[in-house]
Amino acid sequence: MVGDGCSRILLLTADIGEGHNTAARAIAERVDQLWPGTEVRTLDIITMMAPGMSRLTRSTYRLTLDHAPVIYQCFYDALWRHRWFARLSKRVVAAWCGWRLWPRLRRFQPEVVVSTHPFGAAAMDQLRRVHRLALPTATFVTDFAPHPFWVFSEIDAHFVMHEVSAPDTRRLSARGMVCVAAPPISRMFRPRDQGEARDSLGLRASAFVVLVTGGAWGVGSLEPAIAALLNLGDRVQVIAVCGRNQDLLQRLEALGAPRSRLVPLGFVDIMPELMASADVVVTNAGGVTSLEAFASARPVLLVDPIAGHGKANAAMMEQAGLAVVCPGIRELRSTVAELVADQGRLAKMRAAELAHLQGRDLCDDLALLATAEPLPLPPGGGMRQAIRTLTAA
């Protein structure tokens, strides 16, 4: 132990988009602040499953979202509608991930394990059952709308992003703590002076700046959205963050629009400054990008949300009063036009975001986990489980 904290913490994440890694980095940053000297190790749970698995998962997921979103939506819906399907899917993933994680866990001997990806939670659930692990485990549910793959009964704490997220988490068999937490994002995302941010980026001081982003992959209906925004007139200046989607970046650059109207960017490390400069943020998934916008007190418009968890996140964010869902491009255009003309509505949206985050601190959430008692171990699994435990020792 380091003071009242931990000497070794294991973070389980996955390189699927950038949100899960962003959350893990933010947690590591706060651990260093809370308990200097703590050894933090981060593992990519999907890379660990098998050689090439991370690349295969990324490409399959992205192709499905781009070209066959109905397939992903059907899978997501089946997790909710058919308990047997959710249970079977979770147990297969948990067994595979747990088997691959176990030797690494034994070598590192962490005192706390925190997951920012569902597969990390699955692995720890399996190891609690099979190897009778009695160490604190937690999951930061970075989706606003929890889904069955996020929630496992042997996890001590599920940290969710809003009060509206808690009931579904409890309903999905979470028997440990369900806590509303501060978003696991960098401290750089905070309310900042908009004028200074625009000066530093060379943006127009008098413009209505719309930040459009499709996350690290630049997925979704970004081009139609950008075209609709540019048609609103000279008052609107669009910053388009294309992530690693180089084809999209090149197409936007080929438009030849003046910088006073359109600023196309690739993968950037200045997102805090871009958020601070914007009047509104337009995105399509409702993941960590939206959490960063909330922390920056920038209203979020969710346009044509991506299938599955994207649509669920959008609905729950709107229910919480923190975002406006625009089902299509026409609704996006009319909503932005209304906000350009109604600064009072913008101010109310910012106030709602600030009120939601008031008094929340990620350090407090981690300190709670470090002092929590692990859940009672599940009942023994019989001779087969005992043999597996003995042979693995």
List where the protein language model places each region.
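Active-site and donor-binding regions of nucleotide-sugar-utilizing enzymes
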Residues: 73-172, 180
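A short alpha->beta transition loop at the rim of the catalytic pocket in nucleotide-sugar-dependent
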Residues: 278-279, 297-299
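C-terminal "capping" alpha-helix adjacent to the active site of nucleotide-linked donor transferases
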Residues: 319-320, 328-344
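A nucleotide-sugar donor-handling region in carbohydrate enzymes
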Residues: 156-209, 213-216, 244-245
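Acidic donor-binding loop of glycosyltransferase active sites
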Residues: 276-285
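Donor-nucleotide binding loops and adjacent catalytic segments primarily
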Residues: 195-196, 203-277
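Conserved N-terminal ligand/cofactor-binding loop architecture of enzyme catalytic domains
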Residues: 26, 30-104
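C-terminal amphipathic helix plus adjacent low-complexity
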Residues: 343-393
